[in-house]
Amino acid sequence: MKIKYNVIWIDDEWTKMSAFKDECEVIHGIHLEPFTTQKNGMEELDRNLNSWDAVILDAKMFDESEDETPKLDGLRKAIRHIDQLSMKKSIPYFIST
C-alpha cells in the first residue's frame, strides 16, 4: 500500500512489536519510524518537522538514554516539546500504553 502518513514512534520496546509496525505500513499505509528515546525522536522531529504527520508516544519511555529506567519523564518532555512546536506546525500525538 502507498504510504499516506509518516509517524515518529517512540517506544523503548518497539523491537518487540515488529508485527504492529509491519501491519501499519502494509495494511494502513502508515510508515512508523521508531526511536527508543524521547531525545532522539524529538531531535528527528525538529530536523524534519514538515516530513512528519504524527507522533506515537509510549507512556513510559527512555528520556535521553537507554541506560535509564523507562518512566513518565520522557513522555512529559515529549508532549511539552510537541506543544512548543505547534506555532510552526501542529503535530497530533497519541499515547500508547
Regions found by a protein language model. Give the residues of each.
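Acidic, metal-coordinating helix/loop segments flanking the phosphotransfer/catalytic sites
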Residues: 14, 21, 33-58, 62
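Short, flexible/disordered intra-domain loops and linkers
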Residues: 61-76
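A short, hydrophobic beta-strand element within the central beta-sheet of small alpha/beta folds
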Residues: 55, 76-97
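Hydrophobic/aromatic residues located in beta-strands of well-ordered beta-sheets
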Residues: 7, 32, 92-94
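Conserved acidic segment of CheY-like receiver
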Residues: 2-25
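Short, surface-exposed basic-aromatic patches at helix termini and helix-loop junctions that form
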Residues: 23-29, 46-49, 80-88
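A general structural motif
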Residues: 2-4, 50-52, 90
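Short His-Asn-centered micro-motif
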Residues: 10-12, 58, 95-97
